[in-house]
Amino acid sequence: MKNICLYVWGLLMLLVSCTPENRVIDKPVFLASNTTSIEVSKVTLTDSTTVLDIFARYTPGWWIKIASTGYLTDDKGNTYPIQAGHGVELDKEFWMPESGEAEFQIVFPPLKRGVKYIDYIEAPDVEGGFIIWGIQLKDNQLPELKFPKGFKETEVDKNASLPEVKLAYGEAIIKGHVLDYREGMPNKATVLVYSPLMGYTNADAEVDIAPDGSFTYTTQVLGPTTGHVIYADKTANFYVIPGETSELCINLREMSRKVSKFHADAQPYGKELYYNGPFAALVAENAEANQLINRGRSLSKEELLSVSMEDFKKFEITVTEEQKKAVCESSLSEATKAYALTALSNRLLASLDSAPSRIISAYIDSKGDKYDEDDVMAYYQKLMKSVPTDYASELMDVLDNPVSLLSVAYASMVSHAAVKGTTPKNDGLFAQMVGTAKISRGLTDFQPLTEAQKEEMKALPEACQQYLNAKNEELLATIEANKKKTGFRVNETGEVADEDLFASIISKFDGKVRLVDFWATWCGPCRMANKEMIPMKEELKDKDIVYIYITGETSPKGTWENMIPDIHGEHFRVTDKQWSYLCDKYGVEGVPTYIVVDTEGEIKYKSVGFPGVSKMKEELLKLTK
C-alpha cells in the first residue's frame, strides 16, 4: 500500500512538473513582431490549454487570416500547434469592422512547466504570415539588450556643422547587426541604396543574416547618398559615402514597441538604431527631422480644382517657409538643420514639378463615372499652357548645392528632367547630374555607350564618368552572359488576324495549363513579380504548366531581349496595334495582368495586378492533375 501511495504521489509530482501553473499575463511585452495587424492582449495558461487573446487592427472592410499551420515555440525548443480559434475561423477571411479593430482568441496545447517566453509563428510557407517573437511569460520584462563586441556608436556634437558633401564614386560598405537575433527569425534583409540619378535601383539586394545576427553589404555608389535596411517589415535609415563604412545595430524591440497598441507609451527600449558612420547627426535625429520636413499642409482635391498654377506655387512657398522656420527654431543639431533646410527646398521644387499631375488626378477623380479621355486631355493641355516657362527658375539654385544629394526628392528632379530632355541653363551640379542620368537611361535599357556618348561624358565630373564607365562594363558582361542562358524562348506571332492572335498564341501549347503574363520591361511590379515567382516555377516544374509572356512595343526591343533570359518561359513581343486589341478584348487594364488558361483552352482566372505567389500557385494547381 505504501508503494502504491508513493507511486501515485510521484506520478502527481511528474504531472505538476510538466504542466504550467494556471495564470494570466495581461498585455505581455514581446521582443519583436513583423506586423502591426495583430498583437497579444492576454496570455492564459492552464493545465489543458494555452490561450492567446488577440487584438487586431487593420483597414476597415479588409480582411486578415489566421492560418491553421500556426504554432507556438518556447525557449526550450518545444512546439505547440494551433488547435482552434474562438471568434475567428482558421484559414478563413476575417473581415474587419468599420472601427478597424477586433478581438478573438487562438488556442494551443498547454505549455511545459518553466517556459520563460514563447514565439507565435505562422508557417514559413504562409505568404505574409504573422510572427511575434519573445512573448514574455515570467516577469513581463525583456532581457538585457546586448551589442556586438567592439561596436561603438558615433557621438553627435549638436554644435558641429554639416560635414562637406563631395560628389564621388566608389565602394561603400554597410555592416549591420540585428540585435536580439536568434534562430527562427528571418535570415535575410533587404538593403536599398538610393541613387541621386534615378532613386532606388537595387530593390532586389537581399543579404544573408549570419547566426550571430550580423550582415555585410558592399556596393558601388555615386554619392554620398542615403540608404535603408528593411528587416521583419521594419526600416532603418542611414547614409553612405564612397570609400567609407556605415555600421548599424537595428533595435527590433524598440521599433516594435513604438507601433504597439499596448506599449507605445511605455519607457523606450533604447534607440531604434545605433549607428557608427557618416552623417551621424542626421541618422540620430532622422525621426525628428522628418516630422518637421513632412508635416506641412497640402491642398485638398477640391482646392486643387480651383487653384491656378501661380496660386499653387504661392501656397507651396508659404508652407515651405513655415516649415523652415520650425526647423530653425527646433532643438536639432546644426548639421541636421542645414540638411533639413536644403531638403525642404528640394521638396518644394519636387512639389511644383508634380503640380500638373496632382491637379489632373484631382480632375479625373471629380468626374467619377463621367470620366472622358478626350475631356481630360483637353483639360491637361489647357493647364500646361498656363505654366510659365520659368515657373520655378528662381528656386533652382539649391539643386547645385551638393547637400541636395542627401535628399530623396533630388533624384525625382534629376530623373524627371532627364526623361523630359530638359537641359538646365547653367553647367552646375544639377546640369551635370541630369546629363549623367540621360546617358544612364540608355544603359538601363541595355544599350551600351556609343562613341558619341563617350565623347559627351568628358564634360562631366570624374565621379560621373567613373559611374557610367562602370555601368557600361557591367552591361557588356551581362549581354555576353545572356547569350549562354537557356530556359526561355522567343516566339513569332506570325501572320494572324488580331481577333485570332490570343488563340493562336495559346494554341501552340494545347493540352497544358497556361499562365499568360501581360507585362512590360519598364514595369517595376512586373519585374518584382517575375522574381517572386521563380521559386514557385521551380516547385511546379514537374507539373504540365507553360508560362507565356506577352509584351508590346513600349518595351524597347534591346531591353526586352536582354531581360527575358532571366524569365524562363515562352515570350512574345507584339505590335502596338496587336497590344491594343488584346488589352481591349481581354480586359488588360494595366500591367501586370495574368490570365490562367486550362488544358482545354478555357480562361479560368484573371488578375489585374500581381495577386501574390500563394494565390497564383493555388489557381494553377486547381487545373493540374
Identify the residue ranges that each predicted region occupies:
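Short, solvent-exposed, Trp/other aromatic-anchored flexible loops in extracytoplasmic proteins
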Residues: 81-126
